[in-house]
Regions:
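Active-site-adjacent pocket-lining segments in enzyme domains
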Residues: 3-8, 12, 26-35, 54, ...
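N-terminal beta-loop-helix "entrance" segment that forms/cooperates
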Residues: 34-53
Length: 192
């Protein structure tokens, strides 16, 4: 069974995170929602309190390395809070160096860019958050809804959270599973 760690800090965009967690779990992926905060009850950017499965302080290096994909949702001030966490940044570095997948949506691709992971790659993000990253060492902001690279998948924002989540399902469980879920959740493209 594939494993994903999804990180949730104070001020995270709730829909971007929980849509991905929900869709991945529907696909049969083991997803742990990780609090990047003092407590496991974390308030998102729209004052919705989320009970996370574990706290980042509880995770060992083995917990991180067992994950097939690490996921960073967007939201302000959630993204700055994620980026302040040294343990998370170290885990992202190790995941990237191991050739494993990373995913980020909205403002969160900026974290990957500032870590140097977007060199020579197309990426997308919420408009404005590409500044200082696009053009640096060949990183190119495409502006697409979802950008799927060899190791990194990025999404533009909350409005594309379902399509972003389905792209992660396709990466982890294959195109057939993603198509089944797309139809099952009544994605607009499947309604005739």
């Amino acid at each position: 069974m594939k494993k994903v760690l999804a990180f949730f800090a104070e001020g995270t965009e709730e829909i971007e995170c929980l849509m991905v967690v929900d869709i991945l779990r529907r696909a049969g992926v083991s997803v742990e929602l990780i609090a990047v905060a003092p407590e496991n009850l974390v308030k998102g950017s729209h004052q919705i309190t989320v009970l996370c499965d574990k706290n980042i302080s509880e995770l060992s290096e083995n917990d991180f390395s067992a994950a097939d994909l690490l996921f960073l949702p967007g939201g302000i001030p959630g993204v700055p809070h994620l980026e302040e966490n040294k343990k998370l940044l170290e885990a992202l570095q190790k995941q990237f160096q191991a050739g494993k997948d990373l995913a980020a949506i909205c403002a969160a691709p900026g974290i990957l860019g500032r870590l140097g992971f977007l060199k020579g790659q197309n990426f997308t993000s919420y408009p404005g958050f590409e500044e200082g990253i696009s053009g640096v060492e060949g990183a190119k902001w495409s502006g697409k809804a979802v950008e799927v690279g060899q190791q990194i998948i990025t999404g533009r924002g909350m409005g594309v959270a379902l399509d972003f989540a389905l792209a992660l399902v396709e990466r982890l469980e294959g195109a057939e599973k993603a198509a089944q879920l797309k139809k099952g959740v009544q994605h607009p493209e499947c309604i005739v």
